Amino acid sequence: MFLGIDCGTQGTKVLVLDTESGTVLGEGSASHSLISDHNGRREQDVGQWLNALQQATRDALAQSGVSGQQILGIGVSGQQHGLVLLDAQGEVLRPAKLWCDTESAPENQRLLDYLGGAQGSLQRLGLVIAPGYTVSKLLWTKEQYPQLFERIDKVLLPHDYLNYWLTGRCCTEFGDASGTGYFNVRTREWDLPLLAHIDPSGRLGKALPQLVQAHEAVGVLHPEIARLLDLNPAALVSSGGGDNMMGAIGTGNIQPGLITMSLGSSGTVYAYADEARVSEHESVATFCSSSGGWLPLICTMNLTNATTAIRELFALDIAGFNQTVAEAPIGAEGVLILPFLNGERVPALPDATGSIVGLDSTNLTQANLSRAVVEGTTFGLRYGLDLLRDSGIKSEKIRLIGGGSKSAVWRQIVADIMNTPVICTDHAEAAALGAAIQAAWCWSHADGKAEGLQQLCERCVSLDQNSETHPVVHNVAAYQQVYQRYQAQLRKF
């Protein structure tokens, strides 16, 4: 039995996985809240993560009927790019700045200029640093909180911090490290000179966690944490990884030929690669995977956050919102929403704001606005998918995950806009499932069995055949015209 933990933006999810049968026996969840400001600040109190982890673990075990003493391993998935700073006593210095935080966008631009622009960043790191990456948060912290900066002893990502809390050991793996902006994805090494540019004292380089291989365990549970969670004190904690890397494992996307698309708070599209094929498109991030390879990826900053904003504006529940979307025709009678509520990464418009185009006295309806926001967010994913395809990524089918994938009308919109069949996994929360599968993989290595990750995925990742959705020919043609309008609007920014 293995635990998979996913610490996301909106909450923490935990599941209990029986890897012998490939069955999820129980699930639990608990929510987080955001610290937000109009200047782009998006932070969280990491204490919420710990409280949510404890609650969700208790609930998952209770639902499963499994004793915590039967748990052999634990895997942690975490939201990427977040910055958790600890002092020499292991205390958190300030709230964690998150992936969706754009307060440090000016610092990111200064660092990008130092690297020689997009091409210089690609050449040096294998990707282009973007607002939201960890590196600019460090420069921001130094300039905004200089006294606090001098107390930094450990620089961690969200999943690193949870692994540290669970085991007492500071380390990270290549996948999540890829999203820091101070890691070379080709050589899989920290870029220490870049950190020395931010702070010549060398403090930051000394504060970095040790790098470990994806199949390596971090260690066993700390005895105090094992008692707190009522878990087997000999349970191994795996290397873990970022939520996208764990989502790849949780959808079986660990070899070339598959594309995973996540309809979550952010939107992501990614595929596995055997080598670091750095794209010429600066919006494509060639991250490392948490399964031993690489994970070319695009990320949009606005997805269910935008659809939720419209849904709540109209006081609709999810079922009512989906019905309202279905009532409007393709193209929402000319209404087009560019849903850039948090700026945007793909397309690269960090300073953009949202807009509604094409409104008149005849098409201003709940149905049109509801459909337009779903279409607008999906067009952003199409923009990114085109970049991946242009970089040589191919797939005959898309595996959909995330909250939005539960909507039948949204699945049809995705299939039509992408002109590709889509199918959901049985477990939409693929990151938690991937974390549990990776935990089993790490445990098998430590136990001397070395069961292959492919075998585990084949046994534990199942597809929901009832969700399979194919593009409709006349819908594809209609959406191509609407997408061209979307592209024309982008050129005005």
Can you say where each PLM-predicted feature lies in the sequence?
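N-terminal glycine/serine-rich phosphate-binding loop of ATP-dependent small-molecule kinases
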Residues: 1-94, 123, 226-227, 231, ...
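Active-site core segments that coordinate phosphate-bearing ligands/cofactors
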Residues: 3-5, 112-125, 133, 139-171, ...
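Short, glycine/acidic-enriched loop or turn micro-motifs at the edges of active sites
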Residues: 9, 21, 104, 246, ...
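Residue-level signal for inorganic ion chemistry
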Residues: 22, 45, 74, 101, ...
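A generic structural motif
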Residues: 23, 30-33, 99, 177, ...
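Short, acidic/turn-prone active-site loops that include or flank metal/cofactor-
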Residues: 30, 97-104, 177, 265-267, ...
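Short beta-strand-loop/turn "lid" adjacent to the catalytic site in phosphate-handling enzymes
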Residues: 62-99, 127-132, 163-184, 210-218
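A conserved helix-loop-beta module that forms one wall/lid of the active-site cleft
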Residues: 199-213
